Amino acid sequence: MSRPNDRITLPPANAQRTNMTCHFCIVGCGYHVYKWPELQEGGRAPEQNALGLDFRKQLPPLAVTLTPAMTNVVTEHNGRRYNIMVVPDKACVVNSGLSSTRGGKMASYMYTPTGDGKQRLKAPRLYAADQWVDTTWDHAMALYAGLIKKTLDKDGPQGVFFSCFDHGGAGGGFENTWGTGKLMFSAIQTPMVRIHNRPAYNSECHATREMGIGELNNAYEDAQLADVIWSIGNNPYESQTNYFLNHWLPNLQGATTSKKKERFPNENFPQARIIFVDPRETPSVAIARHVAGNDRVLHLAIEPGTDTALFNGLFTYVVEQGWIDKPFIEAHTKGFDDAVKTNRLSLDECSNITGVPVDMLKRAAEWSYKPKASGQAPRTMHAYEKGIIWGNDNYVIQSALLDLVIATHNVGRRGTGCVRMGGHQEGYTRPPYPGDKKIYIDQELIKGKGRIMTWWGCNNFQTSNNAQALREAILQRSAIVKQAMQKARGATTEEMVDVIYEATQNGGLFVTSINLYPTKLAEAAHLMLPAAHPGEMNLTSMNGERRIRLSEKFMDPPGTAMADCLIAARIANALRDMYQKDGKAEMAAQFEGFDWKTEEDAFNDGFRRAGQPGAPAIDSQGGSTGHLVTYDRLRKSGNNGVQLPVVSWDESKGLVGTEMLYTEGKFDTDDGKAHFKPAPWNGLPATVQQQKDKYRFWLNNGRNNEVWQTAYHDQYNSLMQERYPMAYIEMNPDDCKQLDVTGGDIVEVYNDFGSTFAMVYPVAEIKRGQTFMLFGYVNGIQGDVTTDWTDRNIIPYYKGTWGDIRKVGSMEEFKRTVSFKSRRFA
């Protein structure tokens, strides 16, 4: 999205060029950043511009993806101004030069005093008296570290709470997960930590990992090699755009048939097929039908929350048909018979529960698991995301799905895989979590626990389950501290620490937000610390096929903002100095080891030390071969990087990685076998069932293509705000008529857990009694009506809530300016 502009300044041939992985979704498209002095520009002849393209004539289609939104003018700390251009890299195997609406705006979101990023935090900001004031890092650290120290001394680590990112991409990455993790887990040693998108410190894939199969186990190329692709609880066009466009669609179009024949010469290859499992007909379904036709696309529009029954029915059927890999099961797995017995569900029972006709279930099974004419089992890839991750008992759904996948040997063979599609990129390197159980942090806060709460690179006021209850509790507790601080006129920093601590003894909570912007958390915060994002810092992350790349720094961050890992180091060093001053050598020693000057120092301290002699325990997605990865080697690898785990490095080949896991039949369990896991169908959780019985509408929710996460950038983009002035809710037109609402009307959405407001968006493809609301938006928070239910691992059922809807009124401006045409673009 960009404003009309009749020309773009081209980079001169000598412009600086660096590598950038897209900040946003897990696909991690490769981009090049060009930077050159503001008053210079390149010519239209290919030798006169850094793109090497001939702009003197019409370029061929897709010769380059280039829009005004991919350009900006930035100012360095020394006052010098530079043009920047952030364009997709055609040589990157991930995106092959394709851009997305999210990545295509990266340049626009780099900080400029008058641009979309003008609201960025530029200095630590303190809530003083009744207003926000910018302050110094030294002052901020004296207050923040001083309060942590007092809490540790008086209450121990249990008084210090965090909600923190655990991902890659912007606001994450291996450097930053290590810096924050080392501070929280090794230095402060608090177990009172939750992750950005779930209310405890846990995994989203406990079951699959226990079964021996990590969730990112294939390569994007495997989607090109598959006979059948399953998309389960996932909308890949909108959520993983260029994985879908650059790897899935070419297979559906027949463009990868020659590659399949070359790889597997003894197999026949019918035209590729795709199966969607989703109660909602998404834009991805519409596009797939347009590309492949109805005869190669199945949409299993299951009843909400019935995924486990679906997979159990299919598992039972393929076992009965003999469409399983018996030698593989015998040699490389454990627990098959128990799973067959526990998961047994006939197709008739499966159909009654899921609402999917028996003939459609049989067709899905035949496409995916019945041997091909050449005798081999189909190569079937199962890709899943939030419909399972945030589904009806994540643990059991994953178990049921993987039982089916293991039995049919659709993991460890090229063209297969049972994989998460993912949200953010990945980038996890941390010390082991210091707790012995999973703690529901939101509920602890609601109950009045904790003295200091830091939200780091996340915003649970917009994203948590049962969000309204969380906000109400935090705002009430925060107000107690604000009132105490307002009365402490003339207090020194040390005295203010005492004032704040006393207020927390009276039920208060000191709130800190570390982020790019003053998010909705500013309503509760007392201190905000300014962070940096890729391009303003060096950052490594890995994408959904475990491909690690280096996003290189090319500009200064705004003001005194800095990388999260360096913020963590600053906090740790402040605490070390305080304990040394007190003569507490043992406590001071906990905060040693943060003498980092650059992001590379943090990368070397964490990612590269994992599994090495003399290093402490480090949980890292780079594993024990991460030491082979250096910034210099990643620079040489460009936007293609290397797929983790790294196998080797030498001067001629560079970094050599791993395309697919489990190809030799050895899995991540103690005995090296894949473990089947019994997964009975148990219906809906009681809390959720109560809402369904009481209220009319299923309140489904998720992302769309244009808005990234909480709209932390997008809320400042005028075009985005014109398109989505508030969160929309897709509704069936007949339901709209019954409620007397049309596109642009405002409705209240409510149930026993809260209420929120949304803009009506009529959609013919939405079933009656079902809705879909934009998740995590800044204006209209869907999480207010999700329940407080979680599974055994404290994983919420974000998708599982029901409520009623009532008309509030009409917004004539919305009706006049917002398009309510179908988003099923095909």
Curated annotation (Swiss-Prot):
Substrate binds at residues 196, 204, 420, 424. It comes from Alcaligenes faecalis. One of its GO terms (cellular component) is membrane. [3Fe-4S] cluster binds at residues 22, 25, 29. Coiled coil: none annotated. GO terms for molecular function: 3 iron, 4 sulfur cluster binding; arsenate reductase (azurin) activity; metal ion binding; molybdopterin cofactor binding; NADH dehydrogenase activity. Belongs to the prokaryotic molybdopterin-containing oxidoreductase family. Involved in the detoxification of arsenic. Oxidizes As(III)O3(3-) (arsenite) to the somewhat less toxic As(V)O4(3-) (arsenate). It catalyses: 2 oxidized [azurin] + arsenite + H2O = 2 reduced [azurin] + arsenate + 3 H(+). The lineage of its organism: Bacteria, Pseudomonadati, Pseudomonadota, Betaproteobacteria, Burkholderiales. This is Arsenite oxidase subunit AioA. GO terms for biological process: respiratory electron transport chain. InterPro entries: AioA/IdrA_3Fe-4S, AioA/IdrA_lsu, Asp_de-COase-like_dom_sf, MoPterin_dinucl-bd_dom, Mopterin_OxRdtase, Prok_molybdopt-oxidoreductase.
